[in-house]
Design a protein with these regions (language model features):
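Bacterial N-terminal signal peptides
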Residues: 7-16
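Phosphate-group recognition and catalysis centered on beta-loop-alpha active-site segments
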Residues: 19-184
Length: 184
């Protein structure tokens, strides 16, 4: 039993490392001694503690993390000319890397396809972390506006009461520290 747990741990660690390698870096290979069955077991479990840091560096942002069944992704956002772009450094405007196109629309499509859940076999919310790179107050206003059509899919607080949704959204970085505590 302990050997099986150790094998699952090693496989999960290898998968996590492979998922967190930025584009262009060497791919981490799962050890040859790991059996196909162990890989299958590890990849079928939802990795609630796995976090796809700088997720937009993946070949398929969001989708790679979901295929490895990670339960949290991070997207760094920049506000440029009234649009939210996903990038670690300030990007050139490009519709292919907008927050809505890379994260909101694909997440909502998946939730709709899975009966209101990111993972059909889990009742726990998926975590979407947004790191505001600059202009926190202005960015937050636009984020709220962009997320409004999708609000039914997100966890929320209404009059002090928590309502669970398929996705728990949270902010880091240059977040609007003064206005957020006043939000409901």
């Amino acid at each position: 039993y302990m050997k099986q747990i150790l094998s699952l741990f090693i496989t999960s660690l290898a998968l996590c490392t492979a998922c967190t390698s930025p584009k262009g870096s060497d791919t981490v290979q799962v050890a040859e001694t790991t059996t196909e069955q162990t890989i299958q077991k590890a990849s079928s479990a939802i990795h609630y503690n796995a976090f796809s840091h700088n997720d937009y560096w993946r070949e398929r942002p969001l989708l790679d993390a979901l295929s490895f069944r990670f339960n949290c992704v991070e997207a760094d956002l920049w506000l440029i000319d009234g649009e939210l772009y996903v990038s670690h450094d300030r990007p050139e405007p490009n519709p292919a890397i907008t927050f809505e196109n890379l994260y909101l629309k694909p997440l909502v499509a998946r939730i709709q396809a899975n009966g209101g859940k990111v993972y059909p076999d889990s009742d726990r919310p998926f975590y979407l972390m947004v790191d505001c790179k600059a202009q926190g107050e202005e960015m937050y206003k636009l984020l709220k506006k962009q997320m409004e059509p999708y609000k039914e899919y997100f966890c929320s607080v209404d009059n002090g009461e928590y309502k669970e949704g398929a996705v728990l959204f949270f902010l880091s970085g240059d977040r609007p520290k003064s206005s957020l505590p006043k939000e409901n």
